[in-house]
Amino acid sequence: MSSTTVAEFANELKKTPETLLDQLKSAGVPKAAPTDALTEADKQRLLGFLKASHGTAEPERKKITLTKKSTSEIKQADATGRARTIQVEVRKKRTFIQRDDGHPATPEVQPVAEAPAAAPAAPRIDEAELARREEEARRQAELIRRQEEELAEKRRLREEAEAREREQAEKAERAEQAEQEAARIAAEKKAADAAAAAPAKEAAKPAAAPVAAAAAAAEQQAADTKLAAQTAATQAKEDAKAKAAAESKARADEEAARAKDLDERRRKALAEAEAIRAMMNAPARVLVPHKAPEKPQPEKAAVKGTLHKPAAPAARPGAPAAPGAAAAPGAAGAGKEVKSAKLSSSWAGDPAKKKEIKTRGDASGGVGRGNWRGGPRGRRGSNDRGGHEEHVQAAPVEARILEVHVPETITVAELAHKMAVKAQEVIKQLMKLGQMATINQSLDQDTAMILVEEMGHNAVVAALDDPEAFTDEDVSAQTAEALPRAPVVTVMGHVDHGKTSLLDYIRRAKVAAGEAGGITQHIGAYHVQTERGMVSFLDTPGHEAFTAMRARGAQATDIVILVVAADDGVMPQTKEAIKHAKAAGVPIVVAINKIDKPDASPDRVKQELVAEEVVPEEYGGDVPFVPVSAKTGQGIDDLLEQVLLQAEVLELKAPVDAAAKGLVIEAQLDKGRGPVATVLVQSGTLKTGDVVLAGSTYGRVRAMLDEDGRTIKSAGPSIPVEIQGLTEVPQAGDEFMVMSDERRAREIATYRAGKFRNTKLAKAQAANLQNMFTDLSAGEVQTLRIIIKADVQGSQEALAQSLLKLATDEVKVQIVYAGVGGISESDINLAIASKAIVIGFNVRADAGARKLAEGNGVQLNYYSIIYDAVDEIKVAMSGMLAPERREEIIGSAEIRTVFVASKIGTVAGSYITSGSVNRSAHFRLLRDNVVIYTGEVDSIKRMKDDVREVREGFECGIKLKNYNDIKEGDQLEFFEIKEIARTL
C-alpha cells in the first residue's frame, strides 16, 4: 500500500504542514512531524472528519473527473500481407476529490465529537462503496487488457503459423498450450493480488459488518467475472481458429483468381503491343495539312504521335483503321481515350514496373525487355486522373539503350547525365555494387563502365576530345627529310663497376671524382666527338634505388653498354639492366671492365652472363664482349668501334629541319634560374625561343646549355641539352615537343594537369575505401612522416621509393611531400602541421627556414649520399618499434609451509632452492610440474621483517599478489621481464 508524508500531502493540498497537522490531530490521527508517514486509512479518516465538520452540502463540488485521450499509430500486416497503419486511441479517466481549505477547528465544533460513530457512519459507508466500485472497475479494466493482450498474442502466433502451417502443425499446438498456461498463471496471479488487497481493504474499513458483507460480495463478483472471462477467452480462441481457417481458404482462392486474371491481362497486353507495333511500322501516308480541332470529339478515338514522328494513319478522321487497332472501337464505346503508353489500367500499378530503367527522356512508356512496356510516369499519367481534360500521349517507342562514352575519369553527376537518369539512381546502383559515392565523386573508367552495363546501356571507351589529339596532326603535317643521326648510348651496370670512370676516359674528364661518395646519383648526358663520328652517352646510376632512372635511360637509348667488373661478376643491378635493355628492345654491348686487376676473371663473367641469356659472339650469340680498362684505356677504341658498328646496322635516321621532339632526362629547380630540365632531342632541331610542351608543363626556351655549361642556340637530333624557361619542374621521363604557339601549349598542359589530378583523386578514393577495414583491423601502427627535398627530380624519386620500401607491418613510412629545390619556410610549416621530419638531399635550407625549424623543433637532415639517408631513416624506424619482452628466470623456491593470517592472507613459507627472489619479480606456481598460475610477488618477509631480496639457501615468507590457492610441496619459479630494443 502506498503512503506519503505529511509534508508531501500538504503540498498536494496546497496547505502548510502545520495546518494539516492540526487537522489530523483534530481527526484523531496522531501525527507529530511533517516527515511522518500518512497512509490511505489516515487520509480516509481525515476526510470523514472534515465532511462531518463542514457538512455534506453541495456534493457536486466534491469530485472532479478528468478524461485524457491520446492517439498513436501502429503498423500491422493484414490478411493479404500488406502493412497497414492502425490508429490506436487510449482514453484515461481520473477523479479528483476537492478537499476543504485548511482552517483550524473552532471550539464550536467540539460538541460534534461526542458521538463520533453516529454522524460519520453514513459518509464512510458511501466512501467504502465508492472505493469498492473503483476497485471493481480497475479489476474489469485489467481483465479486458489481459484479454486484449491474449488476443493480440494469438493473432501474431496465427500469422506465423499460416506461413509454415504444412510443416509445423505440431509447433502451433505447443504455442497454443503455452498460451493457455500463460492465461492460467495470469488468472492465478490476479486472484492472488485480489486476496492480498482484501486485508488492506479491511484495515481501511474497520466499521464492521456491512463493510465485510460488501467485501464478500465483491470477492464473489470477482470470481464470477474471472469465470466469465475464462469462458469468453476459450470461446474467442475457438472463433479465431475458425475465422483463420476461413480467411486462409479465401486468400488462396483470391490469389488463384488474381494470378489467372494477371495472366489474361498480360496476354491481352502483348496482343495490343503487337498491334500497335504493326501500326507504327506501316508505311506512312501523305496527309493534307489542316488545322487540328480545338477539342477532339470523344467518339473519335485516336492514337497520338510524338513531336518527331507523324501521327498514325488511324488519327485522320475517316481513314481506315490499322489492322492492329481493333481495340479502338471498344474503347470509344466506353467513352475513354486510348492510351498508347498504357496496356492495362490495373497493370499500370504493378510493382514490377518500378524495376525498369528510369530515364529523363520520354517517360510516357515504351516497349522494353520481353515486350513489356512501362506505364506513364508522374501524377498525370493515369487514365482520366486529372478530370475531363484530354492528354496528348506519345507513340510507343522502343526502350532506349544508349551508347555511353566513358572517359578515364568521370563524376557521378556527369555519368548520370550521359545515361539520362537522375544521379540518385546511379548512387543507388553503386551502393548495390558495394561502393559508397557522392554526386561529385570521381569514378575510374573500369567502375563507370561496369555501372553503365549494370544499368542496361552500352559502355564504350571514350575517344578523348582533348587538345592533345591535334598535336599528332601538327607533327604529321610537317614533312622533312630524314638524315642519319648519331647513336644514343646508355651505360648501365652495377654500382661501383666503373661506368662513370669509363665515360671519363672517353670524355677525358673527371666526373666520378665530383660525385658524392664516388657513385652516380642522377643521369648524366654527354655527347662526344670521336674519330669515327659523334656518340651521345647517358650515364645511369647503378644503385638499386635508381630503378626508374635506369628504365628511362633504356627507353631513350639506341644501344646499351653493359659494364661488368671482371673481379665482381654479375650482380643484382646487372641483371636488372639486362631486363631493361631487353624490354626496350635495344642491342647490348658488354664491356668487361677492370681487366687490369690481378683477380680479374673475364671467363667467369661470360659464364654468368650466358646464364642470364646474354650469349657472346664467340659462343654463337649476337652480343659483342669487349674487355676494357677505364684506368689504363685498354680496349676503349674497340668498344667505340663496336658501338658504331651496331649503329650502322640500325641505320639511325631522324628529320633535322622540323619541330623538335624528345625526352626529359632529368629536371631540377635552380634557385637562380628556376625550373631547369635536361632533355635529349630525338628528332628535329630545338632552338632558343621555341615554345616547349613537356608533360603538364610548358614554357618558352630562354636559354640552352650543353653538358659543359656553354650557351648554344640550337640542338639537333641525339644532342642532350639543358633548357630554361619552363613554368614548373617537369617529371623526369616525360616527352617534350615544340608547339606552334603558346596558347595551344597552355591548353594542353592545363588539360594534362587536370586529367592527372582527377586520375590521382579517383585512385586515392578507391585506395582509402579499400584500406579502411585493413587499417581498422591492423590496430595502431606507428607512422614516420617525411618531407623530401632534393636537387634533381630523379634523386627525389629514387630516395622516396627507397624509403617507402622500408615500411613494415608495425612502422609505416609516409611521404608527406617530395619536391626539388631548396628547403623553404613553406616546407617547414608543412612539417610543423604534419609532424614530419625534413630530409634535404644535396640541398640546404635558407636562413628563414632554419630559424623557423629551430623555433618549432623541426628536425632537418642533410644528406649527399643515398646510402646514408636510407640507413639513418632505418635507425629512426627501429626506434619506433615496440620493444621485445623477454623472460629471464632468476630463481626457484619450494613451498614447505602455508600460513594463513587474517589481515594478510595466505603466506607461502618457502625455501629458495636456486638463484634468488626479489619483490619486483614475477612467479609461476607449479604443482606436479604443471603451471597453474602466473602472477607477481606482493611482498617478502624474513623473521617478521620486510626484505627486498632473498638468496639461495634461505627461508622466507612470500605473499603472492591476488592468489591464495597454494599447498605444501608446490614449486615457485621466479623470473623477470626485460625489454630489448628491436631493429629492422
UniProtKB/Swiss-Prot annotation:
Residues 629-631 are annotated as: G5. GTP binds at residues 493-500, 539-543, 593-596. Residues 518-522 are annotated as: G2. Residues 484-653 form the tr-type G domain. Residues 539-542 are annotated as: G3. Residues 493-500 are annotated as: G1. Its main location: cytoplasm. GO terms for molecular function: GTP binding; GTPase activity; guanosine tetraphosphate binding; translation initiation factor activity. It comes from the Bacteria. Residues 104-123, 193-235, 310-335 have a biased composition (Low complexity). It is found in: Cytoplasm. The keyword Repeat does not apply. Residues 92-267, 280-392 are annotated as: Disordered. Residues 363-375 have a biased composition (Gly residues). Residues 124-177, 236-267, 291-302, 351-361, 381-392 have a biased composition (Basic and acidic residues). One of its GO terms (cellular component) is cytosol. The keyword Cytoplasm applies. Keywords: Cytoplasm, GTP-binding, Initiation factor, Nucleotide-binding, Protein biosynthesis. Residues 593-596 are annotated as: G4. Belongs to the TRAFAC class translation factor GTPase superfamily. Classic translation factor GTPase family. IF-2 subfamily. NCBIfam families: IF-2, small_GTP. One of the essential components for the initiation of protein synthesis. Protects formylmethionyl-tRNA from spontaneous hydrolysis and promotes its binding to the 30S ribosomal subunits. Also involved in the hydrolysis of GTP during the formation of the 70S ribosomal complex. This is Translation initiation factor IF-2. It comes from Variovorax paradoxus (strain S110). The gene is infB.
